[in-house]
Regions:
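Glycine-/charge-enriched secondary-structure boundary and capping motifs
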Residues: 2-10, 118-136, 145, 149-152, ...
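N-terminal amphipathic/basic leader segments beginning at the initiator methionine
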Residues: 2-34
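Residue-level signature of catalytic and energy-coupling elements of molecular machines
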Residues: 13, 65, 176, 259, ...
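Short, acidic Gly/Pro/Ser/Thr-rich loop/turn segments
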Residues: 17, 67-70, 163-166, 187-189, ...
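Buried hydrophobic packing segments
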Residues: 20, 24, 91-92, 195-198, ...
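Glycine-rich phosphate/pyrophosphate-binding loop regions near the starts of catalytic domains
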Residues: 26-185
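Short, acidic (Asp/Glu-rich) active-site segment that either coordinates a divalent metal cofactor
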Residues: 166-215, 220, 224-225, 266
């Protein structure tokens, strides 16, 4: 992926981040030999959304993520109850891309100074959203680390399970398959450094209190802080309605699932197209939310760059066999997830967004 100039100006070095991820992956790979021919042997995946361990008849799926600098917005507003949705979404929606049902999560909160009221709000929210997804909080860690961090850092690990014969790797995707887009009304937990930089540059240090220009953004009387804190949609349970929880029957022929996080659609959809001759034509994605259009305008961000930073209203893409399109949309609607046909898989070898 090319370097995104605006993101670099916001203090995010994409090139260094990619290089660091590559180094981390390299050393993680050196540990795989330790489980060779043993229970829990890792399955090597290229570009997957989570790790896979072989447990005989099923795979254990693991993944880690966090809420990133969305926490800073919560700290500005003094509102922490909805961040649990973001934490659950980041890890469970990665795992379900492989067809896995997440059964448990652990979380780690590092804080300059612990505050029992804030911890209570965070964990009460996390418990609420986990219970809705039928996920157990199996453990966690709270650490007061002084000036090692500025504010708080909240991350989680998810553990999921999927039958071997039911794992979704994207290798069965073919031209003519339909791409369904699931709507997202916020930024999820990605691209906040850029959004915050744009708003600070335009409105100063108290940007989160700004209201006047928001009539154009279609968000009523909300402040920019409230808008950015919009909780993520959690797709996990709805997607399980398509692929089935562990031991349940699969309702439709799902061939690939893409969680649209950092990198946007251009950076994430290719991860599930194992046949590099395949591409996609997306001519009916969900429209860009009005507030994101306003961010793009305020920051003078190129649309191409915006696509690689934010989800632009499309939080997940699901590739299904054409014959199962209508049934898929019906199941997603039943699970209260807004979904639409966004396009189709092609033989073009490229992602075309119209």
């Amino acid at each position: 992926m090319k370097k995104i100039k605006k993101y670099a100006l916001a203090g995010v070095n994409i090139e260094e981040g990619d290089a660091s991820s590559s180094i981390a992956g390299k050393f993680a790979g050196t540990t795989f030999a330790g489980r060779k021919n043993k229970i829990g042997e890792p399955v090597k995946l290229l570009g997957g959304f989570a790790g896979i361990l072989d447990f005989g008849k099923y795979y254990l799926v693991t993944g880690d993520d966090g809420v990133g600098t969305k926490m800073e917005v919560a700290e500005r507003l003094g509102k922490f109850d909805s961040l649990g949705a973001d934490l659950v979404a980041m890890v469970s929606d990665d795992a379900v891309c492989l067809g896995a049902e997440v059964v448990s999560m652990t979380n780690t909160l590092d804080a300059a100074k612990l505050d029992r009221k804030i911890v209570g709000e965070l964990l009460k929210g996390l418990a609420h959203f986990c219970l809705k997804q039928k996920i157990v909080i199996a453990g966690g860690e709270l650490a007061e680390v002084g000036d090692a961090v500025n504010g708080m850092v909240w991350n989680a690990t998810a553990i999921g399970i999927v039958a071997k014969k039911r794992v979704i790797l994207g290798d069965k995707i073919k031209a003519g398959d339909i791409v369904i887009a699931l709507r997202e009304n916020g930024l999820r937990s990605n691209g906040f450094s850029l959004a915050r930089k744009i708003l600070k540059d335009n409105f100063g240090k108290d940007w989160h209190k700004e209201k006047p220009a928001l009539a154009k953004a279609g968000v009523g009387n909300k402040t920019w802080g409230e808008i950015l804190l919009t909780p993520s949609e959690i797709y996990h349970a709805a997607v399980l309605g398509l692929v089935g929880r562990f031991g349940e029957k699969r309702s439709v022929d799902v061939r690939g699932i893409c969680h649209v996080t950092g990198g946007g659609i251009p950076g994430n959809l290719p991860r599930i197209l194992k046949n590099k001759k395949l591409g996609a034509k997306l001519d009916n994605l969900w429209p860009i939310p009005k507030f994101v259009e306003e961010l793009i305008r305020l920051g003078k961000v190129d649309l191409e760059d915006a696509r690689e930073v934010w989800n632009l209203g499309n939080g997940m893409l699901i590739v299904v066999a054409a014959k199962d399109t209508a049934r898929s949309l019906k199941i997603l609607a039943k699970n209260k997830i807004a979904a639409r046909i966004a396009g189709a898989i092609t033989n073009s070898g490229k992602i075309e967004i119209v």
